[in-house]
Amino acid sequence: MNSGLSRLGIALLAAMFAPALLAADLEKLDVAALPGDRVELKLQFDEPVAAPRGYTIEQPARIALDLPGVQNKLGTKNRELSVGNTRSVTVVEAKDRTRLIINLTALSSYTTRVEGNNLFVVVGNSPAGASVASAAPVKASPAPASYAQPIKPKPYVPAGRAIRNIDFQRGEKGEGNVVIDLSDPTLSPDIQEQGGKIRLDFAKTQLPDALRVRLDVKDFATPVQFVNASAQSDRTSITIEPSGLYDYLVYQTDNRLTVSIKPMTTEDAERRKKDNFAYTGEKLSLNFQDIDVRSVLQLIADFTDLNLVASDTVQGNITLRLQNVPWDQALDLVLKTKGLDKRKLGNVLLVAPADEIAARERQELEAQKQIAELAPLRRELIQVNYAKAADIAKLFQSVTSDGGQEGKEGGRGSITVDDRTNSIIAYQPQERLDELRRIVSQLDIPVRQVMIEARIVEANVGYDKSLGVRWGGAYHKGNWSGYGKDGNIGIKDEDGMNCGPIAGSCTFPTTGTSKSPSPFVDLGAKDATSGIGIGFITDNIILDLQLSAMEKTGNGEIVSQPKVVTSDKETAKILKGSEVPYQEASSSGATSTSFKEAALSLEVTPQITPDNRIIVEVKVTKDAPDYQNMLNGVPPINKNEVNAKILVNDGETIVIGGVFSNEQSKSVEKVPFLGELPYLGRLFRRDTVTDRKNELLVFLTPRIMNNQAIAIGR
């Protein structure tokens, strides 16, 4: 009994002194516009208060300030402002604190200061030179990191909202940090993770030409492989391509936005998958026994400042206990428990049974279909400039058909193509005409062109050496006598026959045939370029010796450079050469002349990728007739051919193929036994040395032609 009275007394004392714990009262809220599109909120209390703790939310854009020990005495919870960047202010009192929520049009920075019983909140950037009360900046010690070189030391940055620089750094723990310098700290990207890539989209933000590059950061040994920056119209996109398992964090300090990608283990990835949560709403707690479901929906709507429309069929009670649960998850739990569904239109939340919502949407679709079937037909001529009108018309009919049978409009209207003017004549309802114009505007664009330049380099070096000897002689019973005539010096026998001092060749100086036998050792150098002959004569014997030598060197280089321009995904071919004729015999014995092509040709099919790289299917041939090795008057064809499919950057030169051949040979022809004798064997053999080197290289350089280059080319 006494213990029960004690607990009751403690409860009464707590109830009596609970209001005293909230020492300060918020009595007044004033708003004033400041220069530089800034807004000042002045909060007046009945006594001094401590500095608030706050945070910002990006979507929806808002600033939240927590005022500990403060009661709301304003008499209202919501107040519309519509001053500068601020839309409204919401003051919510919970337990021992009061939360001030400032709803913004776009996320902006803010500062706070306390002066006596007043708290000032300034929303917006401070003007240059203004003094803003804030904590003194602390200079952090730089952590050791590996830095990628900036793309350009001082890139040109356009005025307004723009990206100033993009850099890459490697952190201490192997994480890859993509550092983006912004011209305005209020720039906020839309971040998406799709297809294993992290994409940051900056709306109404310019990107200097110097920063529109693709960074290859594989060598930094981080999960990041590439960082690609591009711009289209007034939108800038930065795509980060990591590999393997990773986790990323995005944070911003002043004008610097950092995307940190760190590697993950398999265990971390499994844990992250389990912890992945689809609900992001502000957390709340609900604890009710047998409460009307409409009341729960009203509580959630009040908590989120949403307008609620509930169907009359939403009925029944529910018991729930939820602690620190996101409000959107709590709403889904309530709806699923009672078989309900929701539709959100702006800031209005519509709740009804799932069957009722589905039936209503089916009725709306049927009504729209009936309206479309009764819509008047209009005729319009749409000019197509670059594409084929027939292709676009066929594509339009296929994408707007129902199951490939008939059009959405039940076969009403017609699509006709005029090939002469490359135009589409459409007789369709206005809705389909608008859709046709959108398709034409997206598909009727100039085809990009590519110039392909190939270089075929042939280099050869040759060296030939030959050294040989010839022995010969003649025997005569009589005596020899000498002669000299027409520059020839030799000997003459008794019969008047002449023998010159060439091994074994006894001939008349001008006419006649040889009388002596052939040389008994004929190992002279082939195609000799020099030689020396020695003769030994007795009364009836002549002995001749001829030493001959040949040495030949040579080198050459042939460079062929074909070029061709073609459209994206179109095949082009250029050919230069000749056709070699040759005779063919038929089974009947008749002959006919045929031709074999021997030419230099380049055949390519380029494909431009979305990141301005080029996939090239290429075939390069260089055939030439070999007239030095003709057979039956027909030269063979020396063929050089390369077939490849490669991926290359715009303007980059790549070697797509090469052949190197080295031919070395050494041969010795000699007289058995005599050719093996030391020293003397040199007089009975012929040595030949050959060394030839040939190299073929094929280079390819594709370049994407812009509109200006095409105009100059014309």
Curated annotation (Swiss-Prot):
It is found in: Cell outer membrane. Coiled coil: none annotated. GO terms for biological process: protein secretion; type IV pilus assembly. InterPro entries: AMIN_dom (IPR021731), GspD/PilQ (IPR001775), NolW-like (IPR005644), NolW-like_sf (IPR038591), Pilus_4_PilQ (IPR013355), Secretin/TonB_short_N (IPR011662), T2SS/T3SS_dom (IPR004846), T2SS_GspD_CS (IPR004845). One of its GO terms (cellular component) is cell outer membrane. Pfam families: AMIN, Secretin, Secretin_N, STN. Keywords: Cell outer membrane, Fimbrium biogenesis, Membrane, Protein transport, Signal, Transport. PANTHER family: DNA UTILIZATION PROTEIN HOFQ, PROTEIN TRANSPORT PROTEIN HOFQ. Belongs to the bacterial secretin family. PilQ subfamily. Essential for the formation of pili. Involved in the biogenesis of type 4 fimbriae probably by serving as a 'porthole' allowing passage of the fimbrae through the outer membrane. This is Fimbrial assembly protein PilQ. The gene is pilQ.
